[in-house]
Every structure is written in C-alpha cells, then in structure tokens.
Swiss-Prot record:
It is found in: Secreted. GO terms for cellular component: extracellular region. It comes from the Eukaryota. This is Endoglucanase 1. Has endoglucanase activity on carboxymethylcellulose (CMC). Optimum pH is 5.0. It catalyses: Endohydrolysis of (1->4)-beta-D-glucosidic linkages in cellulose, lichenin and cereal beta-D-glucans. The keyword Transport does not apply. It comes from Hypocrea rufa. One of its GO terms (biological process) is cellulose catabolic process. Keywords: Carbohydrate metabolism, Cellulose degradation, Glycosidase, Hydrolase, Polysaccharide degradation, Secreted. Its EC number is 3.2.1.4. The keyword Hydrolase applies. Its main location: secreted.
C-alpha cells in the first residue's frame, strides 16, 4: 500500500 510501516508479505510491499 503506502510506505507507512515496514515491508510486509513475500513481495516486500509496504503496508
């Protein structure tokens, strides 16, 4: 989603 927290998920996207 948006770079607010830390990278999450296998793709390493920001949530």
């Amino acid at each position: 989603s948006y770079p607010n927290k830390q990278p999450y998920g296998p793709s390493g996207f920001w949530m």
